[in-house]
Amino acid sequence: MTVSESSVLDTEVLVGGSAMPNERPGPMEPQSLSQMPEGFPRRSTVANGVRSRASRRFFVVGGALLLSSFAIYEMGAVFSIGGITPLEYLMLALFAINFCWIALAFCSGIAGFLLLLKKPKPNELAQTELHTRTAILMPTYNESPDRVFSAVSVMAEALSQTGHGHAFDWFILSDTTDPEIALLEEQAFLVLRQETHKHSRVYYRRRRKNVARKAGNVADFCRRWGSRYDHLLVLDADSLMESSTITGLAQRMQADPDAGLIQTIPSLINGTTLMARLQQFAARIYGPVIGTGLGWWVQKEGNFWGHNAIIRTEAFMGAAGLPNLKGKPPFGGHILSHDFVEAALIRRAGWSVVIAYDLPGSYEECPPSIVDLAVRDRRWCQGNLQHSRILPTKGLHWVSRLHLMTGIMAYLSSPFWLLLILTGLMLALQAHFIRPEYFTDQFSLFPTWPIMDSDRALRLFYITMVVLFGPKIFGVLLLLKDGKFARSVGGRIKAMFSVLFEVILSALIAPIMMFIHCGAVMSILMGRDSGWSPQRRDDGSMPWLTLIYRHRWHMLAGVMLGYAAILDSLTLLAWMSPALIGLWLAVPISAWTGSIKIGEFFKRIGILATPEERNPAPICIRAQEARAAYQSHIEQPWTLAQLLKDPALMELHLAMVDKQPLRAAGTPIEPVEAIVHVKVHEAQCQQSALALFNRQEMALVLANPLMLRSLQKLPEQFVPEDLVSFC
């Protein structure tokens, strides 16, 4: 049977029809970064459809510039009494960079705080009939299939009950490379089809080669099936979204013909470890202040965070095709942090990009430990630093460039912070060990005293702390003001204990993350690529020896900084102790925060509680129940040997294999594919062939109907008289 013949079996073998709908190819060309494409920006459909208010930018960005200018002036005045030395100039420059970074967040937080004080109601549209079609995409890469497929199951069922289910199709787009997980995905898809085929259209496709990672996965869908749909609603493997949020996004997109992308602000859920619950609590208490403020002032020049957002297909395919950057990774090659770039390109083309800060019901999960956070941040750091190549792109809106710059600073701020600490330490040691030069070469009746304005320095320190902790303060004030919100996290007293605990623990973790980010930046500057590792999402625990190895340099750095401080004075050591204690205790902090047991203990006593944890949404409860059911459904995974032995099982598998041609005629064959061809051709039986395949080769075979048919023709085991002798 040929590949084309096997596809005919789809509708006969699979419940609910073929694994994927018929293709409707459409162009999605890589965009030029060096020149503005012809016809861009498009003319808005509605008058002022993509215009933003300058007054909001003046309030936030202008306020941040004014605040930064004042702080930089004050810092200069601290040093200027006795003349500014080169080391003090360096410290002033580093202070300016760091302060500008936190001032923007502070002013954005003020806007969010003032807006949330009014308790704004969601911008609800009339429940109009949806006449557009939306593809809901769930990309997955070596994730637990029970998590992914159960989430789609409950969301599809809930959406079908709204009366709008006909307007949506669901797609699980797999880039999985692990053959065992790939077969589990197929089993889970069969269960999903059984559950949903009467009320929803759910599809599954696994790519043979995961070119360009998640961005390439979504782009492959767009080029082959995107033209069938008006919108794409992109989720992540750990995403959940309430049906009202899904329909609300589609209705907003339908109502605004100039909208290119609408991004929700997801709430963090399902954290079991202390680290995950810490992130959940911080995001829930302080996150809305920043998110609301950001959405308010960026207006039509918002951003994309890669998931839990709806995108107009025309805008995405016509304007957001990503080019390959010249050179090799980490700065060249495929664009890793694709989301910021796609949002910038969509806005460049004349579509609006909006952050729907008023739309609830969007959820995601977070890394369970410091180590898992470091693994994720290493990849994000490389992608964000890669944006330095995107900043000069022709035609980008200045706010889009600011988003890119903010992403870069999210990781460069750590080296700048470390340099600021080291410079301050050197100034202290210089004052302690190096004798001042009281009389310079120029004639003077009075000596030059090495002095600073200590009162002004202390005042500036207090101002800096207020700016740094401002968003947290605003979040706490909103919590204390809103009795219902306070009760949802256990009451005001327990909430304040949680806030205090979060501040202390975050202060201990911050220097560890600073050195992790510094290490990531250094490795990228040294030319090391991050790779693409699957994420752990539940248990964050690791053996102590592994943690000692991972944090060895952090502990050593803490000891060296402490030694340098004590050379000056115990007072300096005391001032630096908030940062040093976290480094000294990096291993136990990493172990304890990654522990489910410790996370459950704090959950029992109500510390770091969130409304979503104490009173979870129905969709979250159903997802947990469905996941347990899926785990039981796929507890006996298929194997390639079983597929070869059972023709009916093989037909089921082939019905789910991607129907894209294996290889165009005349194109070079991949080395791994050539190796597999040789192994299959020379194998005496199925048993010997399976013993020769590694995991990569096994995954390739599973995606290749021709190789599977060749293996089927082989006998199951060796027959001694058929052995070939070589002499």
UniProtKB/Swiss-Prot annotation:
Gene3D superfamilies: Spore Coat Polysaccharide Biosynthesis Protein SpsA, Chain A
GO molecular function: hexosyltransferase activity
Transmembrane feature ranges: 58-80, 95-117, 407-429, 457-479, 499-521, 572-594
Pfam families found in the cross-reference section: Glyco_trans_2_3
Signal sequence bounds: none
Protein localization: Cell inner membrane
Pathway membership: Glycan metabolism; osmoregulated periplasmic glucan (OPG) biosynthesis
Keyword entries, A-Z: Cell inner membrane, Cell membrane, Glycosyltransferase, Membrane, Transferase, Transmembrane, Transmembrane helix
EC number of the protein: 2.4.1.-
One GO BP annotation of this record: glucan biosynthetic process
Highest taxon in the source lineage: Bacteria
Predominant place of localization: membrane
GO cellular component: plasma membrane
Topology in the lipid bilayer: Multi-pass membrane protein
Segments for region (Disordered): 17-41
The protein's role, per its UniProt record: Involved in the biosynthesis of osmoregulated periplasmic glucans (OPGs).
Family, similarity comment: Belongs to the glycosyltransferase 2 family. OpgH subfamily.
HAMAP family to which the protein is assigned, alphabetical: MdoH_OpgH (MF_01072)
This protein's name: Glucans biosynthesis glucosyltransferase H
Lineage: Bacteria, Pseudomonadati, Pseudomonadota, Gammaproteobacteria, Alteromonadales
